[in-house]
Each structure stands twice: as structure tokens, then as C-alpha cells.
């Protein structure tokens, strides 16, 4: 097997996925960034959740806001709901794994806050329940999905925003999700603190 050819194939597939996504996703990323900025200037916060690689993306996003992205600026309020193992395991043990995010949202979410809900399939049951809990708390949703949007897409209202990656490959969807997250962080900084160019 020619491993270098296989590696090149992955690079090319990633480039193709991002090129295709660049033709359809920018308007949705722009709207999502504007929603997040409105939340932040209104003294709200952004909660984020997902499973596996999407949990990592949730933490990546919140760390970029709490710390910094590519320039010095004040910390911004964001929280990944994926990091507190005592909370996650107690909810999973006492209730259900499907409730590990929704119970946190019911305690922490406030009207006007945003939930960044991440799932490559759009069908993660605990993320679906997180969206339902966020709506119950009068929060808005920014959903990062893939494939056909899954169950998450059907739960979104007119005040929510879905960034759906046009791919069926989990790896390619995750790669575009990370790029979308970086775009969101950049646009938040641009809108709140002005251009650096």
C-alpha cells in the first residue's frame, strides 16, 4: 500500500469538502456570529456541547472565547458543558446519559443565552435534549451539523441557526466544523473589537 498516496487522498478530500462548504456556509456562519455577538453585548453567555470529537470542538470554542483567539482582548463568557466529569457521571448514573447536557442547561441557561450544539450526524440524543432544554429556557441555538441535519434540524426555530456541512464523511464534517468555529471566533472579535487590518 502506498501510504503517501493515501495521505494525499485525505488532504484532497478535506480540500474538496472545504471548497464545497465555502460555497454554501458563509451566510449561515455570518448569521451565527451576529447572534453570538448580540448575546454577548446583552451580557449573555454561550454554552456549548457535543460528544467525542464534537465535545473537543465545544471545549476548543469555549477556550478561544474565554482566553483569546488571535489577538489580545477581554475574556468572553463561554462554557463547555462537556468538562465536569463529576457532573456528567452523576447525571448519567442517576438519570440518563441523554440528560447530561439538558440538566446543566436548565440550571445555567438564561433567556437570551446561546447554545452551540455540535453533532456530525445531527442525531445525538443528548444534544437533541440539550436543544429542547435550551428552548425551554428561551435560549437561541447555533447548531453545527452534517449529513441531512438529523433530528436537530427539525427542532430549530426561526431564531436559531444551523451550519450544516454538506458531507456524509464524519472526518470531513469535523474538519469543516473546526474551520467554522475559527470563523465564528474571528467574526466575534471583528464585530466586538474592530478590524486589525
UniProtKB/Swiss-Prot annotation:
Its cofactor is Zn(2+). Residues 36-197 form the SIS domain. It comes from the Bacteria. InterPro entries: GmhA/DiaA (IPR035461), Phosphoheptose_Isoase (IPR004515), SIS_dom (IPR001347), SIS_dom_sf (IPR046348), SIS_GmhA/DiaA_subfam (IPR050099). SUPFAM superfamilies: SIS domain. The keyword Protease does not apply. GO terms for molecular function: carbohydrate derivative binding; D-sedoheptulose 7-phosphate isomerase activity; zinc ion binding. Homotetramer. Belongs to the SIS family. GmhA subfamily. This is Phosphoheptose isomerase. It comes from Chromohalobacter salexigens (strain ATCC BAA-138 / DSM 3043 / CIP 106854 / NCIMB 13768 / 1H11).
Amino acid at each position: 500500500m502506498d501510504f503517501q498516496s493515501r495521505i494525499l487522498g485525505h488532504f484532497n478530500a478535506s480540500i474538496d469538502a472545504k471548497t464545497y462548504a465555502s460555497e454554501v456556509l458563509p451566510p449561515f456562519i455570518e448569521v451565527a456570529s451576529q447572534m453570538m455577538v448580540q448575546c454577548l453585548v446583552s451580557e449573555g453567555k454561550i454554552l456549548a456541547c457535543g460528544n467525542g470529537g464534537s465535545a473537543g470542538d465545544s471545549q476548543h470554542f469555549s477556550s478561544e472565547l474565554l482566553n483569546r483567539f488571535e489577538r489580545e482582548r477581554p475574556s468572553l463568557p463561554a462554557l463547555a458543558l462537556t468538562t465536569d466529569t463529576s457532573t456528567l457521571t452523576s447525571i448519567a448514573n442517576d438519570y440518563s446519559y441523554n440528560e447530561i447536557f439538558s440538566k446543566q442547561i436548565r440550571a445555567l441557561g438564561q433567556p437570551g443565552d446561546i447554545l452551540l450544539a455540535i453533532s456530525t450526524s445531527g442525531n445525538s440524543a443528548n444534544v437533541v435534549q440539550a436543544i429542547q432544554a435550551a428552548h425551554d429556557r428561551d435560549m437561541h441555538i447555533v447548531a453545527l451539523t452534517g449529513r441531512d441535519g438529523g433530528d436537530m434540524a427539525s427542532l430549530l426555530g426561526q431564531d436559531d441557526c444551523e451550519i450544516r456541512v454538506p458531507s456524509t464523511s464524519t472526518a470531513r464534517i469535523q474538519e469543516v466544523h473546526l474551520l467554522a468555529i475559527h470563523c465564528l471566533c474571528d467574526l466575534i472579535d471583528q464585530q466586538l473589537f474592530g478590524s486589525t487590518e
